[in-house]
């Protein structure tokens, strides 16, 4: 997820139980032009393995060259191709979900990456179920990707036109899993252990992928594992623990070489901080305050005030 799954957040998710992770997606053209900012999106630590680097683009040969270049920098455990991003600026460059409308071009991209990688690491794909409700072609696309050498496919159960509205269509995801021999990983509307258990029970998927739920609740990985292993629903994480993690994330972001000065790091963190506030007492006011922070100290003060107010409330 662009702007979300950076090296710092992946570290946090790994500590909280994530099994396999993928970097923010990177432009193949940015990689080929030796853009330093783009290269930073591919960074990961060995502690985060297994981890894949996700690429997007519309030219199979260039995508393959970019994948090979990434492997030369620091070999990821796999290369993932993005056929799912619905964002206009990506679609306009014939990347992401735009290729779902053009299966020959999609096949050329998948084959190009597989050829460029040459078996050095597995190549996987992330996709949506179609461009819109009239062109749901996920089963066809999965078969094409399997023929092109993909070794696993993650399917998000919405069309490009849906964005993140409506419900994920797990019937289509199930049909994809039954149509190919390679693993299909289901994604969409997974926010708890109960959600994961239901989808694993009711569909033929080989695995499940948690996305947006982790943005406000990175404990979801640990909670889901506990439910799958024991059937027990974990107690909600205490507000104090939540703020401790928020502050740790801020400090890690500031010390990360990616963001530079503290002010820039905290400005980049604003959207992340607002996401963390989901379910916090007084979340609306907190988001308004966090949208303006420029230092860790400001977040510390906001956290202290939030905890003090919660302690004074009848339910605190």
Predicted regions and their residues:
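Glycine-rich, positively charged N-terminal anion/phosphate-binding segment
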Residues: 1-77
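Flexible loop residues that form catalytic
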Residues: 26, 84, 158, 189, ...
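Hydrophobic faces of well-ordered beta-strands that scaffold small-molecule active sites
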Residues: 21-23, 51-55, 79, 123-127, ...
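Short glycine-/acidic-enriched loop or helix-start segments at secondary-structure transitions
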Residues: 32, 65, 90-91, 195-196, ...
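Alpha/beta enzyme core
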Residues: 15, 61-95, 99-182
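Alpha/beta catalytic cores of nucleotide-metabolism and tRNA/nucleoside-modifying enzymes
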Residues: 2, 7-8, 15, 116, ...
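Short secondary-structure capping/turn micro-motifs that flank functional sites
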Residues: 28-30, 86-87, 161-162, 193, ...
């Amino acid at each position: 997820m662009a702007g979300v799954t950076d090296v710092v957040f992946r570290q946090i998710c790994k500590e909280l139980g994530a099994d396999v992770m993928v970097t923010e997606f990177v432009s193949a053209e940015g990689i080929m032009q030796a853009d330093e900012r783009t290269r930073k999106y591919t960074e990961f630590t060995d502690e985060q393995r297994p981890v894949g680097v996700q690429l997007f683009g519309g030219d199979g040969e260039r995508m393959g060259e970019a994948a090979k270049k990434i492997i030369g920098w620091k070999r990821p455990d796999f290369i993932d191709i993005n056929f799912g991003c619905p964002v206009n600026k990506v679609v306009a460059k014939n990347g992401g979900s735009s290729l779902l409308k053009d299966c020959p071009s999609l096949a050329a991209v998948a084959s190009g990456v597989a050829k460029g990688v040459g078996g050095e690491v597995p190549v996987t794909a992330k996709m949506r179920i179609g461009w819109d409700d009239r062109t749901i072609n996920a089963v066809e696309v999965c078969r094409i990707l399997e023929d092109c050498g993909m070794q696993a496919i993650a399917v998000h159960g919405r069309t490009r036109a849906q964005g993140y509205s409506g419900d994920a269509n797990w019937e289509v995801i199930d049909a994809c899993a039954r149509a190919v021999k390679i693993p299909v990983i289901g994604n969409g509307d997974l926010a708890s252990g109960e959600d994961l258990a239901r989808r694993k029970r009711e569909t033929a998927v080989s695995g499940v992928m948690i996305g947006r739920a982790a943005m406000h609740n990175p404990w979801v990985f640990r909670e889901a594992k506990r439910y799958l292993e024991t059937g027990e629903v974990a107690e909600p994480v205490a507000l104090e623990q939540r703020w401790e993690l928020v502050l740790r994330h801020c400090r890690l972001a500031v010390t990360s070489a990616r963001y530079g000065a503290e002010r820039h790091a905290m400005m980049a963190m604003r959207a992340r901080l607002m996401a963390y506030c989901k379910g916090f007492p007084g979340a609306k006011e907190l988001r308004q305050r966090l949208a303006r922070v420029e230092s860790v100290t400001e977040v510390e003060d906001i956290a202290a005030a939030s905890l003090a107010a919660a302690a004074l409330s009848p339910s605190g």
